[in-house]
């Protein structure tokens, strides 16, 4: 509670699926592990699926969502807000305090943080980098303030980028992932990584298996566990979690599909 958690990883690993599952969970009563509240789902990629939300709810808690009325009541507790520009998103974040109070929001999701930033600040020009840094810093400050003020969780998703060599890592340079050298890591650089309390990295082990890593956390050890995406959401495999040697979360390497030249 009261923290900002980032879920980062390559396309297709289940970041939005994770967010949809958490949305359902937050609407559940507290005795069922929920927050018994409403969810604000800020969608910047038009990735939210109402059909998937209903499927997860029915599969996860069929006793609570067995009728059309029960499903409708649950769906109405997930408030979806679409934003296509950085300025629009920032204006939304600046009014979050009022919305949390008015709509009894108990979970805020931003899916995704990176998409608008990378679209509007794609150039490496110095002025662009300054504007990007200022926008990300302002965005992070607003989200952290809301999380702490109301003691509610804030979830943000992030994408991946490719870094080339030691100099690129030191300077936080981001280059397109289709290049054939370098390594894949979380987008938006080290400055942004310092603004999140917890970082979960989703990655591919192979074409079929996926893994989530706790890359940064104030309370949890560096752990990783395999998972699959099923009708009721993200499901941990039976073998359980494994401890791994942690590294700087800002340069944690990420495994993508084996068809890509990274491993």
What do the PLM-derived regions correspond to, one by one?
Residues 1, 16, 50, 68, ...:
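Amphipathic alpha-helical transducer elements in NTP-driven molecular machines
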Residues 1-66, 70, 258, 262:
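The Walker A/P-loop phosphate-binding site
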Residues 5-7, 40-42, 79-81, 155, ...:
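Hydrophobic/aromatic beta-strand patches that form the interior of the parallel beta-sheet core
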Residues 7, 53, 78, 111, ...:
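Conserved RecA-like P-loop NTPase ATPase core
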Residues 10, 25-33, 56-63, 96-103, ...:
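Conserved, well-folded catalytic cores of nucleic-acid-processing
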Residues 12, 46, 85-86, 114-115, ...:
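Conserved beta-strand elements of beta-rich interaction domains across eukaryotes
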Residues 34-129:
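Conserved inter-motif catalytic segment of the P-loop NTP-binding fold
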Residues 131-137, 141, 145-253:
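Phosphate-binding/switch region of NTP-binding enzymes
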